[in-house]
UniProtKB/Swiss-Prot annotation:
Pathway noted in the entry: Amino-acid biosynthesis; L-arginine biosynthesis; carbamoyl phosphate from bicarbonate: step 1/1; Pyrimidine metabolism; UMP biosynthesis via de novo pathway; (S)-dihydroorotate from bicarbonate: step 1/3
Binding site for Mg(2+) 4: E832, N834
Catalytic activities: hydrogencarbonate + L-glutamine + 2 ATP + H2O = carbamoyl phosphate + L-glutamate + 2 ADP + phosphate + 2 H(+)
GO MF entries: ATP binding; carbamoyl-phosphate synthase (ammonia) activity; carbamoyl-phosphate synthase (glutamine-hydrolyzing) activity; metal ion binding
Cofactor binding remark: Binds 4 Mg(2+) or Mn(2+) ions per subunit.
Descriptive protein name: Carbamoyl phosphate synthase large chain
Gene that encodes the chain: carB
Region (Carbamoyl phosphate synthetic domain) location: 547-929
Entry text on domains: The large subunit is composed of 2 ATP-grasp domains that are involved in binding the 2 ATP molecules needed for carbamoyl phosphate synthesis. The N-terminal ATP-grasp domain (referred to as the carboxyphosphate synthetic component) catalyzes the ATP-dependent phosphorylation of hydrogencarbonate to carboxyphosphate and the subsequent nucleophilic attack by ammonia to form a carbamate intermediate.
Residue sites binding Mn(2+) 3 per the record: Q820, E832
Family: Belongs to the CarB family.
Length: 1070
């Protein structure tokens, strides 16, 4: 079938901000789709609220709207642009839900807009739990015994009939939001209440638990001619009961017999045909390990996280082809871009094994509930490719960047028996390491299978890895065993530990016997056809398929898995750097291991190496490619941390030298540089022991800001108000020693300002100055950033430009740098300098139209700013106002305190842009998922130090018609200021407490500032958690509350009577 010519303009709906369950895979899918549609000659309009994405670059679509993905704003765009069709299936759950809302509101009919890819009936059948169950029954496909419930009473009725455990699956939610496995009544009440609140249609499916069955996924494609094919099948190592996003996954499946594989394949194809999906679809199935019985768990009628994994695992570009199918092309008439000769209906064949391991953020959240279930908790993932399952697994383990270069974690090895058993029987994020520890202690694979239901095949492979470990230790420097270990995926670092030598000695031993990896191509066809894909993985075999080209090359190091503090912003910069290298006439090579991202799309770079970002793995690529140098500025802390080791091995680090990077990151060297440059910073010193830290804090006075050197995302950073709290921090949060010093600074509570700049060594370009709405003390990644700065005097701006220029030239920065300042009155202090790309670079690049990573890369390659057409100094400010608003995933991370501080907690961001600050903030808040009520009740419960400021906010809330509730202390302060307030009981008091009001939906906004002390049992923690669980916005900074108030005031009309003196209202009490 030829492509459709009756449609000209297509609206693509993006997935919005990065949250747990919906990450960079949709930037990858959306980018591919937009380019694919443009390639076919369509006019593409894109709406997405996330500025940190490649897909929101102006070149990706004919019209790019960075606006909230809400019914109101998308409707406005449709009425303005008049698209002929919308494509919602590449925007994750957000895209699907938006399409359903637009349809229900009558907008699609009103504007005559067609839905492409998957029609609304199919979306409803797949997403609505009841409709899906009915369809499966119609097809004769088994689903677990289940019931649709809309309230708790219906849940009780179901449980009385089938007993515990039961699984709760809310309808139309993302990443299992609000779902879980319930073993008792208490868990049922909590999970069902949460699930019904989070489901936009207030509907949950309760089903009989089939935990323990094998979980298998099929990624399938279908076109309008009813051609359907399987791109890839994947097997979860963890059985049913753990969300697939939190499971270790292998592709292709390893334990299915041919009969089982074909059985589940036929079911998947039958389902996609019955749903009449045109494009990609993910089918999740549960297989009884002891029979051929199976159940259909669910279907995602869209491109998903698994699609991104399947695309990278096979090389088959699902999103690109799904977009072509959506406009009428068929699988047998679209060429597979990997081979260039075969067509897209050929099912990919793999002659290698792929392992995916999720990456969690529990290093950030000590108090989080780490237990895994049906609600997703991972922020990102890594993928590795090998010739065997064990090789792929070990490569994936060292890609995680959790301080493990092997299946060996100190906590697991040192755990007592009770902890070991608990960690094995009740899975958490680190179960793999505890399984290895149990095998080392002599537990059998049969015992572990009985406890975990993990297939014996995988446990057997693990046990073989442990056996090989023992042989390595017993035979130091044995060449045969060394070769066997390398084929099995063992790292030099681990072998060095086993043989008590340094890593270099292992390398020398390998060099002596010419034991090096070769690189194999990912070609979708197991070498059956000629392929030109420049996509490689390493393995220890004979034939090398990657050859160095005659062109000079530059290697760019990626940023690895997405985690809090290092998100998609760094992948954005990596991709732009690659494009700039190509524009400058060099071959651009990427090394990265994240299957979700645009940078690991093989069509982006000249060559892609899908490898762990460790010194050993990166050096192997460098040895084969012999590049001009390596760029580390765009890969976040991951790449920066590799620079030292690479330089010591003679690799040229392009851009800022290692010595100058160290001067910016090492505290003592930085202080000396500031002294020479005569730039002030808050008083502080470096401490290398607990005693030293206490002495420094005593000298400069509390409160102090403490943090380790060389960190990203404010990890382990804290404001400490007493000696007792400092001792607790030094013993619990960091392992302080002379090699890992801790910085102790005077905490300045001023206005925080952030600057990104580019320096060529002589000239410094400052695209923009951003001010943070929250005062210093809240991590920059969690603050609302405003551009252009609204509250800075010309003198302060001039000082910032002067300091930035002096710092860039004084530290010999070549490329990008990010500086954070704190402004106290007219005084400006430097907090920190990061000699690399930052998370604000994509935001600033888009709004100033200065492609920062691109320009910085050209500078790194030796060009200067003036020749590139840029005038040094501060770029002219834009007339419009732009805000970057953080987005959090607290609903997924139970037990995590939502209060904001110096440690970063947000997973993503959105942008708001308009002609006034209030309008831009409104868009930012709405896009971030904050519900903006024009009237309602504000609950105020603030620390003593904030009470004076809270009085002014309360007056303003009262003026625009809000009712105010407060706890005793805050209420007394408000009453003294003659502000009408209802006093509510604190937690633990008799009668209705403020928690009851939150749960009953009687509160629309909570303002709760921290009393010091971080114990979660404190009242504040419970107030904040309850607010999040009940979908109520909660502000832990008065600055954020003031920003929301400004927006509400701008949307309100003041209502005052004409009487000269108003009678004061009586003070109400509740």
């Amino acid at each position: 079938m030829p492509k459709r010519d009756d449609i000209k303009t297509i609206l693509v709906i993006g997935s919005g901000p990065i949250v747990i369950g919906q990450a960079a895979e949709f930037d990858y899918a959306g980018t591919q789709a937009c380019l694919s549609l443009k390639e076919e000659g369509y006019r593409v309009v894109l709406v997405n609220s996330n500025p940190a994405t490649i897909m929101t670059d102006a070149e990706m679509a004919d019209k790019v709207y960075i606006e909230p993905i809400t019914l109101d704003f998308v409707s406005r765009i449709i009425r303005k642009e008049r698209p002929d069709a919308i494509l919602p299936t590449l925007g994750g759950q957000t895209g699907l839900n938006m399409a359903m809302e637009l349809s229900a509101a009558g907008i699609l009919d009103e504007c005559n807009v067609e839905v492409l890819g998957t029609d609304l009936t199919a979306i409803k059948k797949a997403e609505d739990r009841e409709a899906f169950r009915d369809l499966m029954n119609e097809l004769g496909e088994p689903v677990p015994e289940s019931d649709i419930i809309h309230n708790l009473d219906e849940a009780y009725t179901f449980v009385e009939r089938i007993g515990y455990p039961v699984i709760v699956r809310p309808a139309y939610t993302l990443g299992g939001s609000g779902g879980g496995i319930c073993h008792n009544e208490q868990e049922l009440i909590e999970t069902v209440t949460s699930g019904l609140k989070l489901s936009p249609v207030t509907q949950c499916l309760l089903e009989k638990s089939i935990a323990g069955f094998k979980e298998v996924e099929y990624e399938v494609m279908r076109d309008a001619n009813n051609n359907a094919m399987v791109v890839c099948n994947m097997e979860n190592i963890d059985p049913v009961g753990i969300h697939t996003g939190d499971s270790i996954v292998v592709a292709p499946s390893q334990t299915l017999s041919d009969r089982e594989y074909q059985l589940l394949r036929d079911v998947s194809l039958k389902i996609i045909r019955a749903l009449e999906i045109e494009g990609g679809c993910n089918v999740q199935l549960a297989l009884d390990p002891d029979s051929y019985n199976y159940y259909v768990i669910e279907v995602n009628p869209r491109v998903s996280r698994s699609s991104a994994l399947a695309s990278k695992a096979t090389g088959y570009p699902i999103a690109k082809l799904a977009a072509k199918i959506a406009v009428g092309l068929t699988l047998d008439e679209v060429r597979n871009p990997v081979t260039g000769t075969t067509f897209a209906h050929f099912e990919p064949t793999l002659d290698y094994v792929v392992a995916k391991i999720p990456r969690f953020a529990f290093d950030k959240f000590e108090q989080a509930d780490r237990r895994l279930g049906t609600q997703m908790k991972a922020t990102g993932e890594v993928m590795a490719i090998g010739r065997s399952w064990e090789e792929a697994l070990l490569k994936a383990v060292r890609s995680l960047e959790i301080g493990a270069d092997h299946l060996l974690l100190e906590e697991a090895e040192n755990a007592d028996e009770a902890t070991l058993e608990r960690k094995i029987c009740f899975p958490e994020d680190d179960r793999l390491f505890f399984l290895a520890a149990a095998l080392r202690r002599g537990q059998t694979i049969e015992q572990l299978h009985a406890k975990t239901k993990i297939d014996l095949f995988f446990l057997y492979k693990l046990s073989k890895t442990i056996e090989l470990e023992n042989r390595i230790k017993e035979n130091p420097h044995n060449q045969e065993i060394l070769a066997e270990a390398k084929r099995a995926g063992f790292s030099d670092a681990f072998l060095a530990t086993c043989w008590n030598v340094d890593e270099q000695a292992i390398y020398d031993l390998r060099k002596a016997q010419n034991l090096f990896p070769v690189y194999k191509m990912v070609d979708t066809c197991a070498a059956e056809f000629e392929s030109t894909t420049p996509y490689f993985y390493s393995t220890y075999e004979e034939e090398n398929e990657s050859t160095r080209s005659a062109k000079e090359s530059v290697i760019v190091l990626g940023s690895g898995p997405i985690r809090i503090g290092q998100g998609v912003e760094f992948d954005y910069a990596t991709v732009h750097s690659v494009w700039a290298i190509q524009q400058a006439g060099y071959e651009a090579i990427i090394i990265n291991n994240n299957p979700e991202t645009v940078s690991t799309d093989f069509s982006i770079s000249d060559k892609l190496y899908f490898e762990p970002l460790t010194l050993e793995d990166v050096m192997h690529v460098i040895e084969i490619e012999q590049p001009l140098g390596v760029v580390v500025q765009f890969g976040g802390q991951t790449a920066i941390n590799l620079a030292d080791g690479l330089a010591k091995r003679g690799v040229k680090i392009l851009g800022t030298s290692l010595e100058d990077t160290d001067r910016a990151e090492n505290r003592d060297a930085f202080e000396k540089a500031l002294e020479i440059l005569q730039i002030p910073q808050p008083a502080g010193k470096t401490a290398t022991s607990v005693e030293e830290a206490i002495n420094v804090a005593t000298d400069i006075g509390y409160p102090v800001l403490v943090r380790p050197s060389y960190v990203l995302g404010g990890r382990a950073m804290e404001i400490v108000e007493s000696e007792e709290a400092l001792k607790h921090y030094m013993t619990n949060a960091v392992k302080v020693n002379p090699k890992h010093p801790v910085l102790v600074d005077r905490y300045v509570s001023g206005q925080e300002v952030e600057v990104d700049a580019i320096s060529d060594g002589e000239n410094v370009l400052i695209p923009g100055i951003m001010e943070h709405i929250e005062r210093a003390g809240v991590h920059s990644g969690d603050s609302i950033a405003v551009y252009p700065a609204q509250r800075l005097s010309s003198q302060v701006k001039n000082t910032i430009v002067d300091y930035t220029t002096r710092l860039a030239t004084g530290l010999n920065i070549i490329g990008m740098l990010n500086i954070q300042y704190v402004v106290d009155g007219e005084e400006v202090f430097v907090i920190e300098v990061n000699p690399r790309s930052s998370r604000t670079a994509p935001f600033l690049s888009k709004i100033t139209e200065i492609p920062m990573a691109n320009v910085a890369t050209r500078v790194i390659l030796g060009e200067n700013l003036i020749d590139l057409g840029y005038t040094p100094g501060l770029a002219p400010e834009k007339q419009e106002i732009f805000v970057k608003v953080p987005v959090f995933s607290f609903a997924k991370l139970r037990s995590v305190d939502t209060s904001l501080g110096p440690e970063m907690k947000s997973t993503g961001e959105v942008m708001g842009k308009d002609v006034t600050l209030e309008k831009a903030l409104y868009k930012g808040f709405v896009a971030s998922g904050t519900t903006m009520h024009d009237y309602g009740t504000v609950l105020l419960t603030v620390a003593d130090r904030d009470k004076e400021e809270a009085v002014e906010l309360a007056k303003r809330f009262n003026r625009i018609g809000f009712t105010i509730m407060a706890t005793k202390g805050t209420a007394s302060t408000l009453e003294e200021a003659d502000i009408p307030v209802s006093q509510v009981k604190k937690i633990g008091e008799n009668q209705e407490t403020l928690i009851d009001y939150i749960r009953n939906g009687q509160v629309t906004l909570v303002v709760n500032t921290l009393t010091t002390g971080k114990r979660p049992e404190r009242d504040g923690f419970q107030i904040r958690r309850e607010s999040v669980e009940n979908g109520i916005p909660v502000c832990t900074s008065l600055d954020t509350a003031e920003a929301i108030l400004r927006v509400l005031e701008s949307r309100s009309f003041e209502l005052e009577s004409m009487n000269a003196s108003e009678v004061k209202q009586p003070k109400a009490r509740v």
